[in-house]
Each structure stands twice: as structure tokens, then as C-alpha cells.
Design a protein with these regions (language model features):
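Gly/Ser-rich "nucleophile elbow"/oxyanion-hole loop immediately N-terminal to the catalytic nucleophile
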Residues: 260-275, 295
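Conserved small/polar residues in nucleotide/adenosyl-binding loops
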Residues: 372
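Alpha/beta-hydrolase active-site loop
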Residues: 243-265
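Short amphipathic alpha-helix adjacent to the substrate-entry channel of hydrolases
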Residues: 215-234
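Hydrolase active-site cap/lid region
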Residues: 290-344
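A glycine/proline-hinged amphipathic helix-loop "lid/cap" segment
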Residues: 117-189
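Short beta-strand/loop motif that positions the catalytic acidic residue
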Residues: 366-368
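C-terminal, flexible cofactor-proximal segment of oxidoreductases
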Residues: 2-114
């Protein structure tokens, strides 16, 4: 909409933004006419996606709390909701240009004597705050992580994490050492403020089997502890390339076995434990469940897998759609794989758990998103 309650113009310099939008629309009409098209209609997919994007933008503002015509409060009985686009004129222009650059994404084009063209899809797939962060990272012109070397990438991640907000408080935080597959491993423990004993979650951090440690997912572990009322034990497993496959996988299993055997000492409830992990950590958590099944324990009652790496096949559509423009690129993922294991190992279920037997495993909750390879 060029102007009116559904456009960005009402929250900007209206005259200028309307003029810019009119110019854009005129250019599109001329280009489509030259191609023989006389009608342009948004697809249902695009409309639904745009409505979600507008709602996501509104949740990041105070407009949703305002008692004004912006929310429909000017007419008694009128449905309430944030009417203007609150994402800003800059992002709006960028989205318009992206629609054109991707072949009129989200629109059905028709005209006499020409074949119908429909490039269906969501115009905006990312949450607005995620889109903003990615834009800020792009403006920093940082070198690709895969060009930094393993230690350089670790140092970069450590510095990068210093700027993140602190995690929320929990009842108690502690550190210690546990027995891994080939020696001691560090862990960080998060205990709820409520009286125990509590169930235990064994957590494995992300980082492509190369980056991160038991401290790197601290805000998430704190939040998980608060939300679940469970003890979270974040494990510092061994990393590639110093320790290639199967070091991380075997450490994950050994750590889970040790934690289950020492539940009392950790203030936990004896019995089954849960496993959780993000990205490469989700890979280790899934592998741990298969190893526990095949090796006679420990008993695992559930698995929380967040964007887990489950297979080593690189011809999936996600590797095409999300090859660039995100923090985890196709090139970075290839780098992680090459450091972690040889091509000959990549069909091993301890590398690609999706290739293993899936019967007899604990129930899994898998959280994923559209923008990962």
C-alpha cells in the first residue's frame, strides 16, 4: 500500500516516502507492461507471510500497547491490532527491491498472449530482529570465519560473545570436571532456585565441533534451567581439528554416562537423564541416544535437538537456499565438516545420526528454522 494505515509512510517523512514508493510502483508497472503482463496479484503464501512479518515487527515496538487509531482503538468495537508497518522505511525499501531481484517473488503475473508467471514464496522469512542483526554483521565486513583458522575463529567468537547480554539468574551455578572418553572434561552446572532433587539435562554446545565450550551457551543454559526447573550440565567436549571424529561423539556418550552415574553428587534426581544440544551439539545429543541404546545405557528419557546436524548430505535444498547471507554459510559448514572428519567417515551414524537405526530411541523435540543449511 502506497499510503494509508498499512504502509510505512505514516511513521516516516510521509511526503518523501510516498514519492519514493510511487516511483517504485511506476517502474514496476512499466517493466511488467514491457514484458506483456497486465495484472499482478500477491499469492496467498506471500500475503500470509507478510501479515506474519508485520505482526513480528509490531511485537518489537510499543505501538501494540497504544490506545490510538494505529491499533484501531479510534472506533468502538473495531478489531484491535497494529495497522501500520513498523519495520521502518529502510527495511521496507530493501524488501521491495528484494521482491524485484528475486523475479517478483510472491506475485502472480498474467497478461494476454503471455504465459502466466508465478514465483510463489514468502517475501520475508526472517524475524525482523534477526534480519537487523544480520544486516549489522554485514556492515562490519568481517572476514569469513573459515578463513581465520580454528584458533583465530575461537578467539573471534570469544570476543564476539563479550557483547551479548548477561544470562538471567538461576539458583546456583558451578563448575567441575567429569570423565570423558579419553580423560577429564570441564562442565558448567546450572541449578534451579527451587528445592531439589531435580531432573538432569546433559547439554552440548554448538560450534561445528570446532568452536565454543561449556561456557559459550551460558544465556541459553540459564534460560533452559529457569523454564524447565531442571539441572543443566553443559559439557566441554573435545574439539576438531586437534581431536577429530570420533572424539566429540565418544565424549558426549561418556559424559552422559558419568553424569547419570553421579546424579546424587550433582544434586540431581537419580534415574533417567535428558540430553540436549544446539547445532553440532544437537548432533552429539542425537548420537549419544543411539550409543546409549546400543551400549546398554544410561537410560535417556528425552532429547531436545535445536537445529541439529543430522546428516552429511550437501545436495539438500537448504544448502542452496541458505548458502550465503546468514552467519552459518555453506562454505563455513563445509569447513566444519572437513575439520571434524574425513569424507570416508561421513556415513558413520556417529557422524550422521539420521543414517543410523531410529527404533528404540527416546522421544525427541526438534526445533529448526528455515534459514539454516
Amino acid at each position: 500500500m502506497i499510503t494509508g494505515p498499512g504502509s510505512p509512510s505514516v511513521l516516516s517523512n510521509m511526503a518523501v516516502s510516498i514519492e519514493q514508493h510511487v516511483d517504485w510502483v511506476v517502474e514496476r508497472i512499466a517493466a511488467l507492461r514491457d514484458a506483456g503482463f497486465t495484472t499482478m496479484e500477491a499469492t496467498d503464501t506471500a500475503q500470509a507471510g507478510w501479515e506474519r512479518h508485520m505482526a513480528d515487527c509490531a511485537t518489537l515496538t510499543l505501538h501494540r500497547l497504544a490506545n490510538t487509531w494505529y491499533t484501531g482503538a479510534n472506533v468502538p468495537g473495531k478489531p484491535q491490532g497494529v495497522m501500520p508497518y513498523t519495520g521502518g522505511v529502510g527495511p521496507y525499501r530493501s524488501i521491495c527491491n528484494e521482491v524485484v531481484g528475486r523475479g517478483m517473488l510472491g506475485f502472480r503475473l498474467t497478461g494476454p498472449g503471455v504465459a502466466e508467471q508465478c514465483n510463489d514464496g514468502e517475501v520475508v522469512r526472517l524475524q525482523p530482529d534477526v534480519r537487523l542483526v544480520l544486516g549489522m554483521l554485514a556492515e562490519m565486513n568481517l572476514p569469513p570465519i573459515e578463513t581465520m583458522g580454528a584458533q583465530g575463529a575461537r578467539d573471534f567468537l570469544t570476543e564476539f560473545n563479550k557483547g551479548r547480554p548477561a544470562g538471567r539468574p538461576v539458583g546456583e551455578v558451578g563448575t567441575g570436571m567429569l570423565q570423558g572418553a579419553d580423560g577429564p572434561l570441564p562442565y558448567k552446572l546450572y541449578r534451579p532456585a527451587t528445592a531439589g532433587p531435580h531432573p538432569i539435562v546433559v547439554y552440548f554446545h554448538g560450534g561445528g565441533w570446532v568452536l565454543g565450550d561449556e561456557l559459550s551457551d551460558d544465556p541459553f543454559c540459564r534460560d533452559l534451567c529457569r523454564r524447565t526447573g531442571m539441572i543443566i550440565v553443559s559439557v566441554g567436549y573435545r574439539h576438531a581439528p586437534e581431536h577429530r571424529f570420533p572424539a566429540a561423539a565418544e565424549d558426549g556418550y561418556a559424559a552422559t554416562r558419568w553424569i547419570a552415574a553421579h546424579a546424587d553428587e550433582l544434586g540431581g534426581r537419580p534415574g533417567p537423564v535428558l540430553v540436549a544440544g544446539w547445532s553440532a551439539g544437537g548432533n552429539i545429543a542425537a548420537v549419544t541416544c543411539q550409543l546409549a541404546r546400543d551400549r546398554g545405557g544410561p537410560e535417556i528419557s528425552g532429547q531436545l535437538l535445536i537445529c541439529p546436524v543430522t546428516d552429511s548430505t550437501f545436495d539438500r535444498q537448504s544448502y542452496v537456499d541458505n548458502a550465503a547471507g546468514y552467519f552459518l554459510t555453506r562454505g563455513l559448514m563445509f569447513w566444519f565438516w572437513d575439520l571434524y572428519c574425513s569424507p570416508a567417515d561421513r556415513t558413520d551414524p556417529r557422524v550422521a545420526p539420521l543414517r543410523g537405526k531410529l527404533e528404540g530411541l527416546p522421544p525427541a523435540f526438534i526445533a529448526d528454522r528455515k534459514s539454516v543449511v
